[in-house]
């Protein structure tokens, strides 16, 4: 691997840990906050230095468009942008979900996208159109397409899709002794507490990637 400065190594390791833990690389703001930089611009300077050394790739216009390219054999699966020449994976796009019906019910599927499999940290089952800004600070915005893998279990800190009664929501999972907390990544939105054993809660899946419609 190319020799990095101590600070560059910290940034590289932070990106790697974030991908291993959540399936997403961090945003510039998250790197700055974690490593004590004065601003996201400082994080951007370090990212550009890493890109010049050939250990990461940066995708223009994507807040989490960071791809590790050094030490390929031991890197975690990671987010990349789609490559137009490799469009293999067919994914249904889920729009609005009707109360009480399965998330992949035919009436919820508005269209199908062909995607590059390397876009995702692991193989997704569907795309969910994000509505609202509750996950803004995680780089997930209204209208984005969240790639979701169906799961019955999720790890602490992962971004999940959950059903709460008649609603479907995207939040970050935090386990507590008495239940679950669904964390909003936007101070304008309240977190949601779910009592242990609540029949109102059902895990629909975990986020394994993100697509901006403009990327197609």
Curated annotation (Swiss-Prot):
Q: Which reaction does it catalyse?
A: Hydrolysis of Ala-|-Gly bond in repressor LexA
Spell out the residues of the site Cleavage: 99-100
Q: Which domain of life is it from?
A: Bacteria
Annotated InterPro entries: LexA, LexA-like, LexA/Signal_pep-like_sf, LexA_DNA-bd_dom, LexA_repressor, Peptidase_S24_LexA, Peptidase_S24_S26A/B/C, WH-like_DNA-bd_sf
Q: What is its EC number?
A: 3.4.21.88
The entry's DNA-binding region: 28-48
Write down what this protein is called. Answer: LexA repressor
